[in-house]
């Protein structure tokens, strides 16, 4: 298998929806909004196996100081093959001159995974949100 990585946003709404649903992420249930968000954020990197979208990472940033990796996902058929690591490294290179690169690890196994990629837990912080759905 030869995986191709790109920063081109040449995926369809359906491809994004299918990838997000493959990992049971609620964003996949809102394909129009998801696609709009991915088309309008600052950075998107994708991973492809032929014409199949198998991985995606996106980030939003303030232009110079802080970037937030919002999505990082790999299709279950391809997890464990280094795709998430490569997408993360692409983000780290893209934002190497920023002071902060943040992400949210939503479960304990992900904390260890991201620590292995150079991220550190921030003591005394809590993720907070206003959810409309």
Residues covered by each model-derived region:
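A short helix-loop-beta-strand connector motif used in the catalytic cores of GNAT acetyltransferases and
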Residues: 35-46, 100
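Conserved GNAT acetyl-CoA-binding A-motif
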Residues: 88, 93-106
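Short alpha-helical
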Residues: 11, 64, 108-109
């Amino acid at each position: 298998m030869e995986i191709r990585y790109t920063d081109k946003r040449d995926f369809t709404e359906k491809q994004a929806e299918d990838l997000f649903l493959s990992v049971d992420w609620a964003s996949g249930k809102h394909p129009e909004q998801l696609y709009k968000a991915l088309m309008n954020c600052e950075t998107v990197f994708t991973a492809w196996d032929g014409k199949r979208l198998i991985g995606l990472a996106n980030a939003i940033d303030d232009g110079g100081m802080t970037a937030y990796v919002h999505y990082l996902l790999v299709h279950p058929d391809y997890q464990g093959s280094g795709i998430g690591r490569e997408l993360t490294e692409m983000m780290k290179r893209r934002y190497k001159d920023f002071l902060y690169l943040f992400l949210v690890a939503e479960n304990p196994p992900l904390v260890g995974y991201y620590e292995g990629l150079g991220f550190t837990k921030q003591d005394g912080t809590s993720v907070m949100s206003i959810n409309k759905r």
